């Protein structure tokens, strides 16, 4: 099993990267936070933790910036009805400690900031997290607070716009402009303002 990779970053996209190790290029699926970490590291050496998936449909590598993120991914994908790609999508928006706080507060609205996670889908995910709350509690840090995920509103809004069809440069600028005018905006409010053209 491939648990980690160290090598030159050859290619970087929103949801994947290619890292060259000893002359071999490995394509790795990644969450959005790792994409942000790697933005300025093309053609330089990187180190990532990986989860090596082997199924009847083939093999895939998933990459993470920390061991904790990889363990969060493994926990999320172990929930009933949640596959690897859905788990990666969730991890692009929220870490395991965020999900713990969301479930404790029964905050379906926050969970629905993830594109296409609405209605019965968000209810099912929330239910599964609640059923495994003790496991998610293990990811809490001493500094974790009820509003810890609020600090990532900018990243949430940027990713949401990209998934709506904006290119990354435009999405980043639009979000920065909106936050400059009103620093207290939530991710969903930023996205609404950008789409409607209001400020």
From Swiss-Prot:
Cited Pfam families: HHH_5 (PF14520), RuvA_N (PF01330)
One GO term describing the cellular component: Holliday junction resolvase complex
Keyword vocabulary terms for this entry: Cytoplasm, DNA damage, DNA recombination, DNA repair, DNA-binding
InterPro entries linked: DNA_helicase_Holl-junc_RuvA_I (IPR013849), NA-bd_OB-fold (IPR012340), RuvA (IPR000085), RuvA_2-like (IPR010994), RuvA_C (IPR011114), RuvA_C_sf (IPR036267)
Biological process per Gene Ontology, one example term: DNA repair
Main localisation: cytoplasm
Domain III as annotated region, ranges: 155-199
Residue numbers spanned by region Domain II: 66-144
Region (Flexible linker): 145-155
Region of interest (Domain I), ranges: 1-65
UniProt subcellular location: Cytoplasm
GO molecular function list: ATP binding; four-way junction DNA binding; four-way junction helicase activity
Free-text comment about domains: Has three domains with a flexible linker between the domains II and III and assumes an 'L' shape. Domain III is highly mobile and contacts RuvB.
Job description of the protein: The RuvA-RuvB-RuvC complex processes Holliday junction (HJ) DNA during genetic recombination and DNA repair, while the RuvA-RuvB complex plays an important role in the rescue of blocked DNA replication forks via replication fork reversal (RFR). RuvA specifically binds to HJ cruciform DNA, conferring on it an open structure. The RuvB hexamer acts as an ATP-dependent pump, pulling dsDNA into and through the RuvAB complex. HJ branch migration allows RuvC to scan DNA until it finds its consensus sequence, where it cleaves and resolves the cruciform DNA.
Family indicated by similarity: Belongs to the RuvA family.
Protein name: Holliday junction branch migration complex subunit RuvA
Organism encoding this protein: Leptospira biflexa serovar Patoc (strain Patoc 1 / ATCC 23582 / Paris)
Gene: ruvA
């Amino acid at each position: 099993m491939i648990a980690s990779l160290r090598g030159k970053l050859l290619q970087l996209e929103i949801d994947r990267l290619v890292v060259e190790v000893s002359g071999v290029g490995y394509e790795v699926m990644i969450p959005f936070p790792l994409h942000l970490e790697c933005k300025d590291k093309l053609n330089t050496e990187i180190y990532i933790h990986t989860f090596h998936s082997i199924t009847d449909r083939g093999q895939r590598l998933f990459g993470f910036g920390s061991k904790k993120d990889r363990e969060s991914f493994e926990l999320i994908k172990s929930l009933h009805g949640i596959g690897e790609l859905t788990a990666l999508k969730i991890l692009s928006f929220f870490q395991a400690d965020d999900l713990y706080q969301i479930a404790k507060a029964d905050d379906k609205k926050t969970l629905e900031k993830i594109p296409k996670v609405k209605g019965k889908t968000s209810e099912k995910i929330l239910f599964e997290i609640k059923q495994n709350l003790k496991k998610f509690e293990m990811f809490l840090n001493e500094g974790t607070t009820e509003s810890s995920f609020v600090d990532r509103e900018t990243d949430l809004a940027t990713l949401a716009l990209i998934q709506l069809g904006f290119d990354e440069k435009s999405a980043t600028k639009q979000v920065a402009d909106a936050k400059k005018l009103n620093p207290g905006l939530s991710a969903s409010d930023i996205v609404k303002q950008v789409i409607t053209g209001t400020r």
